[in-house]
């Protein structure tokens, strides 16, 4: 049986751990609120660009752009959003596991795909496994600005336009609630379904394009694709903080339960020690009579 000193030491260390997990839970909750606001505020911008691009695509005008055209797939690009830090439950592991299973099903060789990774945890794991990392970005702030990922977003789109990739996907955790994050694969390029946007049919007649539709498309399509990458990052950040808040809440609850259990064990051990001392005193007194 553990001594009173050992039990007391475990209680003290568990209380310190509980203080840390509680603090991390509160910090994550505050960051989650800001991340949700950022993601929700950016959505109208992406929606409006999509509406204009879809209106042009469905206007009947003869337009063409590499980002709208399907071609035989020789190489696929995966933009993967993970976190730099752990202690977020299954936030990273679920995403990475799903991606690895998808890669195994779709590709026979590393020459058939490339990974553009955001986040230290994903970067380290992919390097350890020897997967083909084309580009990486780590150390992103908790509230990222577009400039933080502008280079990697622009490079990703250019690699598709230049024919290095024939299709491009974004993998991230979509925020549903603090306790639920859905692993999401979004096909970024080519934008083959954008002309079917229902809003575009009614909106197409309300736009006049200067100098012409093709010139507008040349400008907007790369911006739209880059905005989708940034929007996915904002969504993933909200998911990360929600997952970490939930994980730290569970850790805090577990610490509380352990402290209660250890306290009960400590009280029983102390009671047994006191009883033993009383028994020894009574026994000693009886022996003196």
UniProtKB/Swiss-Prot annotation:
GO BP, one annotated term: proton motive force-driven plasma membrane ATP synthesis
Major place of residence: membrane
Pfam families, A to Z: ATP-synt (PF00231)
Locations listed in the record: Cell membrane
InterPro entries recorded: ATP_synth_F1_ATPase_gsu (IPR035968), ATP_synth_F1_gsu (IPR000131), ATP_synth_F1_gsu_CS (IPR023632)
Quaternary organization: F-type ATPases have 2 components, CF(1) - the catalytic core - and CF(0) - the membrane proton channel. CF(1) has five subunits: alpha(3), beta(3), gamma(1), delta(1), epsilon(1). CF(0) has three main subunits: a, b and c.
Family in the record: Belongs to the ATPase gamma chain family.
CDD domains hit by this protein: F1-ATPase_gamma (cd12151)
Membrane-topology annotation of the record: Peripheral membrane protein
Gene transcribed to yield this protein: atpG
An example molecular function term from Gene Ontology annotations: ATP binding
Domain of life (superkingdom): Bacteria
Function of the molecule: Produces ATP from ADP in the presence of a proton gradient across the membrane. The gamma chain is believed to be important in regulating ATPase activity and the flow of protons through the CF(0) complex.
Alphabetic keyword roster: ATP synthesis, Cell membrane, CF(1), Hydrogen ion transport, Ion transport, Membrane, Transport
Classification via Gene3D superfamilies: 3.40.1380.10, ATP synthase, gamma subunit, helix hairpin domain (1.10.287.80)
Name of the featured protein: ATP synthase gamma chain
Transmembrane spans: none
One Gene Ontology cellular component annotation held by this UniProt entry: proton-transporting ATP synthase complex
């Amino acid at each position: 049986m553990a001594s009173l000193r050992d039990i007391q030491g475990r209680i003290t260390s568990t209380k310190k751990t509980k203080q840390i997990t509680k603090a991390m839970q509160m910090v994550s909750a505050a960051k989650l609120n800001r991340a949700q606001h950022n993601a929700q505020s950016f959505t109208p911008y992406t929606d409006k660009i999509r509406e204009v691009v879809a209106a042009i695509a469905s206007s009947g005008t003869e337009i063409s752009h590499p980002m709208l055209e399907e071609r035989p797939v020789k190489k696929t690009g995966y933009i993967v959003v993970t976190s730099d830090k752990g202690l977020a439950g299954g936030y990273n592991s679920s995403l990475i596991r799903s991606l690895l299973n998808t890669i195994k099903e779709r590709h026979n060789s590393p020459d058939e795909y490339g990974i553009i990774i955001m986040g230290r945890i994903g970067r380290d794991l992919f390097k350890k496994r020897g997967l083909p990392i084309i580009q990486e970005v780590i150390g992103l702030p908790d509230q990222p600005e577009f400039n933080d990922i502008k280079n990697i977003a622009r490079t990703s789109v250019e690699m598709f336009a230049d024919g290095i990739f024939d299709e491009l996907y974004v993998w991230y955790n979509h925020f549903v609630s603090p306790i639920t994050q859905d692993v999401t694969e979004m096909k970024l390029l080519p934008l083959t379904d954008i002309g079917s946007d229902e809003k575009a049919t009614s909106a197409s007649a309300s736009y006049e394009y200067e100098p012409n539709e093709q010139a507008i498309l040349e400008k907007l399509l790369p911006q739209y694709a880059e905005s989708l990458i940034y929007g996915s990052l904002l969504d993933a950040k909200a998911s990360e903080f929600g997952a970490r808040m939930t994980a730290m809440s569970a850790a805090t609850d577990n610490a509380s339960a352990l402290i209660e259990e250890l306290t009960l064990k400590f009280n029983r051990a102390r009671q047994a020690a006191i009883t033993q001392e009383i028994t020894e005193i009574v026994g000693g007194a009886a022996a003196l009579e």
